[in-house]
Amino acid sequence: MRAVWTGAVNFGLVNVPVKMYAATEEHDLKGHLAHVQDGGRIRYHKVCETCGEQVHTADLGKVFEVDGQTALLTDEDLAELPSENNKVIDVVEFVPAGEVDPILLDKPYYLNAEGSVRPYALLARTLSDADKVAIVRVTLRSKEHLAVLRVTGKNEVLTLQTLRWPDEVREPDFPKLDNKPELSEAELKVAAMLVDELSAPFNPDKHQDTYKVELRALVESKLEPVEVPEDVSGLLAKLEASVKPKQAKPDIRTWAKAQGFKISARGRIPKDIVDKYEGAMA
């Protein structure tokens, strides 16, 4: 795995050097838009709706809207913002493990010890023994995150999972649920029996993404066979040459007599006959 961040966890007076790695990866089959008629890939260009010209990345800015008014900020403007130390994970507080609402949980990362393992093991064991998690602040890709730091797995691996800020979570507003019906004992009993019948230890490996499996099968069924062009006549000649036993060349005088040329048994062989012989033996 390739580290996405390197820094340290500040745990009181203890500094825990770590490297951060993405804990998840996607295995979805990637695709792109194409023209149905000829299979050509679809390309997009950034075009200004005011002047109609194509805009290069270096000329892009961001417009923010507040109370109906807009402000255009450039990369230089954003660079002036004060930023937190992007090499430190600051522990804010420790809370009981069950108090963090799962709806707040976002992207997970693994932390590996960088350098000495002792401070890493100390923090991991402390969290595990106390059955608590650490609420931390960390800056990733120039953006500050609130995150939870906890211990996972039999090797007590520190796992950091970013949290959504409270204002990013919507309140459920479902008036229909304000007046729930009374449930009978019989209904509750049957429902409880069904839960007991379907109860089992959670094993994610026994579940599979059926859509992904069927999509791959569909794609493979439409793959065009790759044709490898080859010179059939040339290949046949090479095969015949490989299996045909090589015959010894006949003596030039024997060959010449077989061809009807008149030459002496000991005299010099004319050059034109030598040339014909060599051409025939090539």
Curated annotation (Swiss-Prot):
- Please give the InterPro entries that the UniProt record associates with this protein: E3-bd_dom_sf (IPR036625), Ku70/Ku80_beta-barrel_dom (IPR006164), Lsr2_DNA-bd (IPR055370), Prok_Ku (IPR009187), SPOC-like_C_dom_sf (IPR016194)
**Which cysteine pairs are covalently linked by disulfides here?**
none
Q: What is this protein called?
A: Protein Ku
Please list the GO terms describing molecular function.
acyltransferase activity; double-stranded DNA binding
The keyword Cell inner membrane appears for this protein: no
Role of this protein: Required for replication of viruses with short cos ends (4 bases). Stimulates dsDNA end-joining by host LigD; in conjunction with M.smegmatis or M.tuberculosis LigD can reconstitute NHEJ in S.cerevisiae. Binds dsDNA with either blunt, 5'- or 3-overhangs, protecting it from host exonuclease degradation.
Instruction: Describe the location of the Ku domain by residue ranges.
Output: 9-189
Q: Name one GO biological process term.
A: viral genome circularization
What UniProt keywords are attached to this protein's entry? Answer: DNA end degradation evasion by virus, DNA-binding, Host-virus interaction, Inhibition of host innate immune response by virus, Viral genome circularization, Viral immunoevasion, Virus entry into host cell
The species this protein belongs to is Mycobacterium phage Omega
Subunit comment: Homodimer. Interacts with host LigD, maybe via the LigD Pol domain.
Xref: Gene3D superfamilies: 2.40.290.10, E3-binding domain (4.10.320.10)
**Does the record carry tRNA-binding as a key word?**
no
Q: Name the gene.
A: 206
